[in-house]
Protein backbone atom coordinates (compact mmCIF):
# COMPACT_ATOMS: atom_id res chain seq x y z
CA UNK A 1 0.00 0.00 0.00
CA UNK A 2 2.80 2.41 0.92
CA UNK A 3 4.71 1.55 -2.26
CA UNK A 4 1.60 2.35 -4.31
CA UNK A 5 1.34 5.72 -2.58
CA UNK A 6 5.01 6.51 -3.20
CA UNK A 7 4.92 5.45 -6.86
CA UNK A 8 1.61 7.23 -7.51
CA UNK A 9 2.71 10.43 -5.81
CA UNK A 10 6.05 10.43 -7.60
CA UNK A 11 4.29 10.23 -10.97
CA UNK A 12 1.85 12.98 -9.93
CA UNK A 13 4.78 15.19 -8.92
CA UNK A 14 6.36 14.55 -12.29
CA UNK A 15 3.27 15.67 -14.20
CA UNK A 16 2.68 18.67 -11.94
CA UNK A 17 6.21 20.07 -11.71
CA UNK A 18 7.88 18.92 -14.93
CA UNK A 19 6.88 22.04 -16.91
CA UNK A 20 8.03 24.37 -14.12
CA UNK A 21 11.49 22.80 -14.21
CA UNK A 22 11.98 23.37 -17.94
CA UNK A 23 13.93 26.43 -19.09
CA UNK A 24 14.68 25.92 -22.79
CA UNK A 25 11.42 23.99 -22.86
CA UNK A 26 9.59 27.27 -22.15
CA UNK A 27 9.90 27.79 -25.92
CA UNK A 28 8.02 24.56 -26.53
CA UNK A 29 4.50 23.28 -26.53
CA UNK A 30 5.05 19.96 -24.77
CA UNK A 31 2.32 17.37 -24.35
CA UNK A 32 2.15 14.30 -22.14
CA UNK A 33 1.36 11.15 -24.09
CA UNK A 34 0.14 7.91 -22.57
CA UNK A 35 0.89 4.39 -23.75
CA UNK A 36 3.80 5.36 -26.00
CA UNK A 37 6.70 3.11 -26.93
CA UNK A 38 10.16 4.16 -28.04
CA UNK A 39 10.07 4.87 -31.77
CA UNK A 40 6.39 5.89 -31.84
CA UNK A 41 5.35 9.03 -33.71
CA UNK A 42 2.83 11.23 -31.91
CA UNK A 43 0.82 14.28 -32.93
CA UNK A 44 1.47 17.48 -31.02
CA UNK A 45 -1.15 20.18 -31.61
CA UNK A 46 0.53 23.57 -31.72
CA UNK A 47 -1.29 26.76 -30.61
CA UNK A 48 -3.47 28.28 -33.31
CA UNK A 49 -3.13 31.42 -35.43
CA UNK A 50 -5.86 33.90 -36.34
CA UNK A 51 -6.58 34.95 -39.95
CA UNK A 52 -6.77 38.71 -40.69
CA UNK A 53 -8.15 40.30 -43.87
CA UNK A 54 -8.81 43.68 -45.50
CA UNK A 55 -12.18 45.23 -44.63
CA UNK A 56 -13.72 47.98 -46.77
CA UNK A 57 -17.27 47.98 -45.42
CA UNK A 58 -20.33 45.79 -45.88
CA UNK A 59 -21.12 42.42 -44.38
CA UNK A 60 -18.31 40.43 -42.86
CA UNK A 61 -17.53 37.05 -44.41
CA UNK A 62 -18.09 33.89 -42.40
CA UNK A 63 -15.48 33.38 -39.74
CA UNK A 64 -12.67 31.02 -40.57
CA UNK A 65 -11.72 28.27 -38.20
CA UNK A 66 -8.69 29.20 -36.11
CA UNK A 67 -5.78 27.40 -37.74
CA UNK A 68 -4.12 24.84 -35.52
CA UNK A 69 -1.09 23.05 -36.85
CA UNK A 70 -0.35 19.47 -35.95
CA UNK A 71 3.25 18.36 -36.01
CA UNK A 72 4.68 14.88 -35.80
CA UNK A 73 7.22 14.19 -33.07
CA UNK A 74 9.08 10.90 -32.81
CA UNK A 75 9.45 9.54 -29.29
CA UNK A 76 13.04 8.46 -29.81
CA UNK A 77 14.77 9.20 -26.52
CA UNK A 78 14.53 7.78 -23.04
CA UNK A 79 15.82 8.44 -19.56
CA UNK A 80 15.98 5.84 -16.82
CA UNK A 81 16.10 6.65 -13.13
CA UNK A 82 16.39 4.98 -9.78
CA UNK A 83 16.28 6.22 -6.21
CA UNK A 84 16.34 4.68 -2.79
CA UNK A 85 14.33 5.44 0.33
CA UNK A 86 15.81 4.44 3.65
CA UNK A 87 13.50 2.49 5.90
CA UNK A 88 13.31 5.41 8.32
CA UNK A 89 12.17 7.67 5.46
CA UNK A 90 9.47 5.19 4.48
CA UNK A 91 8.35 5.06 8.12
CA UNK A 92 8.20 8.85 8.24
CA UNK A 93 5.95 8.85 5.18
CA UNK A 94 3.83 5.99 6.51
CA UNK A 95 3.33 7.71 9.89
CA UNK A 96 2.52 11.15 8.49
CA UNK A 97 -0.60 12.58 10.08
CA UNK A 98 -2.63 12.87 6.87
CA UNK A 99 -2.56 12.20 3.12
CA UNK A 100 -1.44 15.75 2.34
CA UNK A 101 1.64 15.43 4.51
CA UNK A 102 2.44 12.03 2.97
CA UNK A 103 2.31 13.58 -0.51
CA UNK A 104 4.57 16.47 0.53
CA UNK A 105 7.15 14.07 1.94
CA UNK A 106 7.18 11.94 -1.21
CA UNK A 107 7.54 15.11 -3.28
CA UNK A 108 10.55 16.13 -1.19
CA UNK A 109 12.30 12.83 -1.89
CA UNK A 110 11.40 12.61 -5.58
CA UNK A 111 11.84 16.17 -6.89
CA UNK A 112 15.49 15.63 -7.76
CA UNK A 113 14.46 12.97 -10.29
CA UNK A 114 11.92 15.39 -11.79
CA UNK A 115 14.57 18.12 -12.08
CA UNK A 116 17.06 15.78 -13.74
CA UNK A 117 14.52 14.48 -16.25
CA UNK A 118 13.48 18.04 -17.17
CA UNK A 119 17.14 19.00 -17.61
CA UNK A 120 17.61 16.09 -20.01
CA UNK A 121 14.63 17.19 -22.11
CA UNK A 122 15.99 20.76 -22.09
CA UNK A 123 19.27 19.46 -23.54
CA UNK A 124 17.34 17.82 -26.38
CA UNK A 125 15.56 21.11 -27.11
CA UNK A 126 18.94 22.92 -27.09
CA UNK A 127 20.18 20.64 -29.89
CA UNK A 128 17.49 22.08 -32.19
CA UNK A 129 19.50 25.29 -32.72
CA UNK A 130 20.44 23.90 -36.15
CA UNK A 131 16.79 24.34 -37.21
CA UNK A 132 16.72 28.10 -36.55
CA UNK A 133 15.22 30.23 -39.31
CA UNK A 134 16.92 33.35 -37.94
CA UNK A 135 20.65 32.96 -37.43
CA UNK A 136 23.62 35.27 -37.01
CA UNK A 137 27.35 34.76 -36.51
CA UNK A 138 30.45 36.91 -36.72
CA UNK A 139 30.92 36.34 -40.45
CA UNK A 140 32.55 33.49 -42.36
CA UNK A 141 31.19 31.06 -39.79
CA UNK A 142 33.10 32.65 -36.92
CA UNK A 143 31.57 33.19 -33.50
CA UNK A 144 30.56 36.62 -32.23
CA UNK A 145 32.79 37.54 -29.29
CA UNK A 146 30.42 38.87 -26.65
CA UNK A 147 31.18 42.18 -24.99
CA UNK A 148 29.48 44.90 -23.00
CA UNK A 149 29.12 46.93 -26.20
CA UNK A 150 27.52 44.30 -28.46
CA UNK A 151 25.35 42.10 -26.24
CA UNK A 152 22.36 44.46 -26.52
CA UNK A 153 22.96 44.82 -30.27
CA UNK A 154 22.60 41.06 -30.66
CA UNK A 155 19.24 41.10 -28.87
CA UNK A 156 18.06 44.09 -30.94
CA UNK A 157 19.18 42.37 -34.16
CA UNK A 158 17.16 39.29 -33.31
CA UNK A 159 14.19 41.47 -32.40
CA UNK A 160 14.32 43.07 -35.87
CA UNK A 161 14.55 39.68 -37.61
CA UNK A 162 11.49 38.40 -35.76
CA UNK A 163 9.47 41.59 -36.29
CA UNK A 164 9.93 41.50 -40.07
CA UNK A 165 7.47 38.60 -40.41
CA UNK A 166 6.04 37.58 -43.77
CA UNK A 167 4.63 40.96 -44.94
CA UNK A 168 1.10 39.47 -44.77
CA UNK A 169 0.27 40.65 -41.28
CA UNK A 170 1.89 37.63 -39.68
CA UNK A 171 4.73 38.83 -37.52
CA UNK A 172 6.99 36.44 -35.69
CA UNK A 173 7.10 38.88 -32.78
CA UNK A 174 4.45 38.83 -30.05
CA UNK A 175 4.93 41.44 -27.34
CA UNK A 176 5.26 39.94 -23.90
CA UNK A 177 5.85 36.41 -25.19
CA UNK A 178 9.40 36.57 -26.53
CA UNK A 179 12.10 34.55 -24.78
CA UNK A 180 15.87 34.61 -25.16
CA UNK A 181 17.64 31.65 -23.56
CA UNK A 182 21.30 32.31 -22.94
CA UNK A 183 24.28 30.72 -21.15
CA UNK A 184 25.55 32.20 -17.86
CA UNK A 185 28.45 33.87 -19.72
CA UNK A 186 25.92 35.92 -21.70
CA UNK A 187 24.33 37.11 -18.46
CA UNK A 188 27.74 38.32 -17.26
CA UNK A 189 27.80 40.94 -20.03
CA UNK A 190 24.11 41.79 -19.65
CA UNK A 191 24.86 42.93 -16.11
CA UNK A 192 27.08 45.67 -17.56
CA UNK A 193 24.31 47.15 -19.76
CA UNK A 194 22.67 50.24 -18.22
CA UNK A 195 19.07 49.65 -19.29
CA UNK A 196 19.04 45.93 -18.55
CA UNK A 197 16.06 45.33 -16.23
CA UNK A 198 16.80 42.81 -13.50
CA UNK A 199 14.08 40.62 -12.01
CA UNK A 200 11.68 42.82 -10.08
CA UNK A 201 11.68 42.39 -6.32
CA UNK A 202 8.33 41.24 -5.00
CA UNK A 203 7.51 39.45 -8.26
CA UNK A 204 4.73 36.97 -7.47
CA UNK A 205 6.23 34.04 -9.31
CA UNK A 206 9.66 33.97 -10.87
CA UNK A 207 9.89 31.39 -13.64
CA UNK A 208 12.87 29.07 -13.41
CA UNK A 209 15.82 30.63 -15.22
CA UNK A 210 14.29 34.11 -15.63
CA UNK A 211 16.83 36.86 -14.90
CA UNK A 212 15.51 40.04 -16.52
CA UNK A 213 14.39 41.92 -19.64
CA UNK A 214 16.13 43.75 -22.46
CA UNK A 215 15.17 44.79 -26.00
CA UNK A 216 11.72 43.22 -25.61
CA UNK A 217 13.06 39.81 -24.60
CA UNK A 218 12.40 37.94 -21.38
CA UNK A 219 15.88 36.62 -20.71
CA UNK A 220 16.37 33.20 -19.18
CA UNK A 221 19.67 31.58 -18.26
CA UNK A 222 20.35 27.88 -18.71
CA UNK A 223 23.43 25.69 -18.38
CA UNK A 224 21.84 23.49 -21.05
CA UNK A 225 22.30 25.99 -23.90
CA UNK A 226 24.26 24.10 -26.54
CA UNK A 227 28.01 24.51 -26.18
CA UNK A 228 30.67 23.08 -28.48
CA UNK A 229 34.27 23.01 -27.22
CA UNK A 230 37.22 22.91 -29.61
CA UNK A 231 40.86 23.86 -29.05
CA UNK A 232 40.09 25.03 -25.53
CA UNK A 233 37.31 27.44 -26.57
CA UNK A 234 33.59 26.93 -26.13
CA UNK A 235 31.10 28.25 -28.65
CA UNK A 236 27.51 28.69 -27.48
CA UNK A 237 24.22 28.76 -29.38
CA UNK A 238 21.62 30.79 -27.45
CA UNK A 239 18.01 30.41 -28.59
CA UNK A 240 15.32 32.99 -29.32
CA UNK A 241 11.63 32.40 -29.85
CA UNK A 242 7.99 32.67 -28.82
CA UNK A 243 6.96 31.18 -25.52
CA UNK A 244 5.13 27.87 -25.97
CA UNK A 245 4.88 28.16 -29.77
CA UNK A 246 8.35 27.61 -31.19
CA UNK A 247 9.30 24.01 -30.43
CA UNK A 248 7.26 20.84 -29.94
CA UNK A 249 7.70 17.95 -27.55
CA UNK A 250 6.05 14.72 -26.55
CA UNK A 251 6.71 13.19 -23.13
CA UNK A 252 5.44 9.86 -21.83
CA UNK A 253 3.00 10.34 -18.96
CA UNK A 254 3.84 6.88 -17.62
CA UNK A 255 7.14 6.52 -15.78
CA UNK A 256 6.89 2.75 -15.38
CA UNK A 257 8.07 2.97 -11.77
CA UNK A 258 8.68 -0.29 -9.93
CA UNK A 259 9.64 -0.77 -6.25
CA UNK A 260 12.09 -3.51 -5.31
CA UNK A 261 14.28 -4.51 -2.37
CA UNK A 262 17.77 -5.82 -3.22
CA UNK A 263 19.18 -8.80 -1.40
CA UNK A 264 20.91 -8.02 1.90
CA UNK A 265 19.47 -4.51 1.88
CA UNK A 266 16.76 -3.20 4.21
CA UNK A 267 16.01 -0.15 2.08
CA UNK A 268 13.49 -0.02 -0.78
CA UNK A 269 14.59 1.14 -4.20
CA UNK A 270 12.48 2.43 -7.08
CA UNK A 271 13.37 2.24 -10.75
CA UNK A 272 11.66 3.39 -13.91
CA UNK A 273 12.03 5.30 -17.14
CA UNK A 274 10.41 8.03 -19.18
CA UNK A 275 10.35 8.53 -22.95
CA UNK A 276 10.37 11.76 -24.92
CA UNK A 277 10.93 13.35 -28.30
CA UNK A 278 11.35 16.92 -29.58
CA UNK A 279 10.97 18.85 -32.82
CA UNK A 280 11.12 22.33 -34.35
CA UNK A 281 8.05 22.72 -36.57
CA UNK A 282 8.33 26.52 -36.99
CA UNK A 283 11.81 27.50 -38.11
CA UNK A 284 10.56 31.07 -38.56
CA UNK A 285 9.74 31.18 -34.84
CA UNK A 286 13.26 30.08 -33.83
CA UNK A 287 16.46 32.11 -33.74
CA UNK A 288 20.02 31.31 -32.76
CA UNK A 289 23.46 32.90 -32.75
CA UNK A 290 27.01 31.61 -32.63
CA UNK A 291 28.78 33.31 -29.73
CA UNK A 292 31.80 32.96 -27.50
CA UNK A 293 32.67 34.79 -24.31
CA UNK A 294 35.74 35.54 -22.26
CA UNK A 295 34.87 36.87 -18.82
CA UNK A 296 37.32 39.21 -17.10
CA UNK A 297 37.04 41.23 -13.89
CA UNK A 298 38.21 44.80 -13.39
CA UNK A 299 39.27 45.48 -16.96
Question: Can you name each region flagged by the protein language model?
Answer:
Residues 40-42, 81-83, 107, 111, ...:
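N-terminal, well-ordered alpha-helical segments
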Residues 69-99:
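Short acidic, glycine/tyrosine-flanked loop/strand segments centered on an H-E-D-like triad
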Residues 95-168, 288-299:
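Alpha-helical scaffold segments that mediate packing/assembly in large oligomeric complexes
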Residues 98-109, 170-178, 234-239:
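Glycine-rich, flexible loop segments associated with nucleotide phosphate handling
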